[in-house]
Amino acid sequence: MENAKMNSLIAQYPLVKDLVALKETTWFNPSTTSLAEGLPYVGLTEQDVQDAHARLSRFAPYLAKAFAETAATGGIIESELVAIPAMQKRLEKEYQQPISGQLLLKKDSHLPISGSIKARGGIYEVLAHAEKLALEAGLLTLDDDYSKLLSPEFKQFFSQYSIAVGSTGNLGLSIGIMSARIGFKVTVHMSADARAWKKAKLRSHGVTVVEYEQDYGVAVEEGRKAAQSDPNCFFIDDENSRTLFLGYSVAGQRLKAQFAQQGRIVDADNPLFVYLPCGVGGGPGGVAFGLKLAFGDHVHCFFAEPTHSPCMLLGVHTGLHDQISVQDIGIDNLTAADGLAVGRASCFVGRAMERLLDGFYTLSDQTMYDMLGWLAQEEGIRLEPSALAGMAGPQRVCASVSYQQMHGFSAEQLRNATHLVWATGGGMVPEEEMNQYLAKGR
């Protein structure tokens, strides 16, 4: 972006200067509104989410047999919700900032099949596509036992079709493993920052991996192009997909059930704050949408991004959304948080969700490494760097009097609050790689 344009952008949005300087930045959204007001802008409804629930239930008998690790939950892919009191104390000590309320961790990092939040959206979209093809071919009815999809006849049928996706890693892992298991031919277009072990794991499942020297945006674009030339190839579009988004949104009702099981209350007197790592936006956007439908105006969602890849904060704050990239303002989009290394936000999620998100913040790679080490020491839980992005959120919220006043929170409401950090990945990171991460923390 030329200097004059840049200067005028900074004059209009002074916060951009801090982003350019790679400062850890917090922006509380002044335009946040009620669910009733914000919902029409999403373009999806509670019914759409219920349809996604129903589809995942239909596929549960299939998943329970296709993936032994889901048998115990009857083919439902869901993660644990755990309290992390020792980590809460450690954060308070390190940052000299009390966290009012209780700190919890949602362990999507340990979801079965692919060990990340992408096991929600990625697997869901592959299943939705497989169901559509099988229904159209008359091989399946909605009342069937879907475990019949494991038969050689279905494998043969699906092998005529292929799936393509562009990814920095975890989405590719989810879509690749699921597509290959069903019988699709599958190609994952991987950006330069994708971890070698993720590529190796995909290849071990018979997935074709195409590697690029460039970033996420290029991998997605090339994947899209390659798919266009083949009528039997379905491209899963991480930047725009409503189906992926709905796969993630199912998490809202599931979390509500987990809260009920644990006797946790969310209402006006007991607010819930949720901190979601954000790359292109589909995962956190879908989860936040589901949470809003489940908990209404009593849940407050925040997106967390690396200082080197603040695409969603930049897009929503300036109102330019996908019309601006971090590279346009001189930021390199290079971060250890490979799942969040996205320079240009989704053209769908920011516009759909901007009225329903309470805020956005950035944190440095070093902060992620530090917290990764503390969590391993204090709670014995090991995550990949990007999964720690949410962990910086509770301090930002508890330290901001202006945010608390904006929403009229009393000291008592904050004492009764639940802070939920969404851990997005790391359950499948190889030991030696994890040791390298741990060595980088202070």
Curated annotation (Swiss-Prot):
Highest taxon in the source lineage: Bacteria
Q: What EC number(s) does the entry state? A: 4.3.1.18
- Which reaction is the catalytic activity of this chain? D-serine = pyruvate + NH4(+)
Q: Which Gene3D superfamilies match?
A: 3.40.50.1100
Entry GO MF terms:
D-serine ammonia-lyase activity; hydro-lyase activity; pyridoxal phosphate binding
The record's annotation in CDD domains points to: D-Ser-dehyd
Alphabetized Pfam families for the sequence: PALP
Kindly state a single biological-process term from the GO annotations of this entry: D-serine catabolic process
Q: Which UniProt keywords apply?
A: Lyase, Pyridoxal phosphate
What cofactors does this protein use? pyridoxal 5'-phosphate
Q: Which residues carry this modification: N6-(pyridoxal phosphate)lysine?
A: K118
Quaternary form? Monomer.
Entry-linked PANTHER family? D-SERINE DEHYDRATASE, THREONINE DEHYDRATASE, MITOCHONDRIAL-RELATED
Name the family the entry cites: Belongs to the serine/threonine dehydratase family. DsdA subfamily.
NCBIfam families in UniProt: D_Ser_am_lyase, PRK02991.1
Q: What is this protein called?
A: D-serine dehydratase
